[in-house]
A protein has these predicted regions:
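N-terminal core-binding DNA-recognition domain of tyrosine recombinases/integrases
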Residues: 2-9, 23-38, 47-129, 143-144
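Active-site/catalytic core of tyrosine-dependent DNA strand-transfer enzymes
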Residues: 202-255
Length: 271
C-alpha cells in the first residue's frame, strides 16, 4: 500500500508480531547474561498478560501504532483495579511498559514512548509487606526438616542466618565454601549487585554441611541440585518456593503470608 509506505511502515506491524519480536529480543538478552533469570521470567509474564488482556478487550488493538498512552493507562488500571493487585505490582508493570516502549522507539515501531507521562505511585505511599515468622513456627520448621529434608534445612539456614538470596543460593557450588576459614564466597557472577563477597558461616551451618557430607561431592557441583542435594545439574531457585508452598505450608499448616523468603525477613531467632 503506497499510503502505508509513505508513512512509517513499521507502525503497521501487528501487535502480535511485535510482541513476538520483543520476546525474542529479551530471550537473547537473557541468554547473553544481560538479564537475570528473575528479570527475564518477569518480563515474559508481563508480556503474556498484556497480550491476554488485549485479546480479551471488546475491540482489541491490531497494529502496533494503536498501542498508545490510553491503552497503557487502561492496562495499568486493569492490573491494579480489576485484578486487585498491590501498588508495587502496578508499578512493576509500569516499569515493564517503559522498557517495552523503549524497545518500540529504538526499533522504529513508534516515534515516541506510548507510556510517557504515566507516573509511578509514590514509594512513600507503599507499605512494604514483611512477614515475620513466629519463633514457635521456626522451631516446628526446623524439627520437621531435620526429620524429613535436611538438605532443604541447609537452604533455610543460608537464607536465614547468612542472608543469601534464593537466586544466589541456587547458584552456589561446593568450591565456594572454605571449610578451614568457615566462609562462603558469593562470586560476582552469582551476586545480585555483581560484586564478590566473602561471608562467614555460623558454626551450626558448618555442622549441618558436615552432617550432610556435602564436601564428598566434586567442587564444581551445585550445593542444591535435584532434590536439594549436591549435583552437576543447575536447578532454578523456584524449587525452594515450590517445596515451601506445596509441602511445608500443607504439612505445617503455615499461613499463606509465610513464604520461603520470610526467613530472610525474620530476625535471628533459634531455629
Amino acid at each position: 500500500n503506497p499510503w502505508i509506505e509513505s508513512e512509517n511502515s513499521r507502525a503497521y506491524h501487528t501487535f502480535g508480531e511485535v510482541c513476538e519480536k520483543y520476546h525474542q529480543y529479551i530471550t537473547k538478552l537473557f541468554d547473553d547474561g544481560i538479564y537475570r533469570e528473575e528479570t527475564y521470567v518477569g518480563y515474559v509474564s508481563y508480556l503474556r498478560n498484556l497480550q491476554a488482556w488485549n485479546d480479551s478487550r471488546r475491540v482489541p488493538i491490531t497494529y502496533i501504532y494503536q498501542f498508545d498512552n490510553f491503552v497503557c493507562s487502561e492496562f495499568l488500571d486493569h492490573v491494579y483495579i480489576d485484578r486487585k493487585n498491590s501498588v508495587q505490582t502496578r508499578n512493576n508493570y509500569l516499569t515493564f511498559l517503559g522498557v517495552f516502549s523503549s524497545f518500540l522507539v529504538q526499533h522504529q515501531y513508534m516515534k515516541t514512548k506510548p507510556c510517557e507521562g504515566l507516573q509511578r505511585i509514590g514509594k512513600s505511599l507503599i507499605k512494604k509487606e514483611r512477614t515475620i515468622i513466629d519463633p514457635s513456627d521456626m522451631e516446628r520448621l526446623r524439627d520437621y526438616l531435620l526429620e524429613h529434608n535436611k538438605h532443604y534445612l541447609l537452604a533455610c539456614y543460608l537464607l536465614h542466618y547468612v542472608l543469601i538470596r534464593p537466586k544466589e543460593i541456587s547458584m552456589l557450588k561446593i568450591k565456594d565454601i572454605n571449610l578451614c576459614k568457615q566462609t562462603i564466597t558469593i562470586t560476582a557472577v552469582v551476586s545480585k549487585n555483581k560484586k564478590t563477597a566473602v561471608v562467614t558461616l555460623p558454626e551450626k551451618v558448618i555442622h549441618l554441611m558436615l552432617d550432610l557430607e556435602i564436601f564428598k561431592y566434586p567442587g564444581d557441583d551445585y550445593i542444591f541440585s535435584r532434590g536439594f542435594k549436591p549435583g552437576s545439574v543447575f536447578v532454578e531457585s523456584k524449587q525452594f518456593r515450590d517445596y515451601w508452598t506445596r509441602t511445608l505450608r500443607k504439612e505445617l499448616k503455615f499461613p499463606n503470608s509465610y513464604k520461603f523468603y520470610s526467613l530472610k525477613d525474620t530476625g535471628i531467632t533459634e531455629m
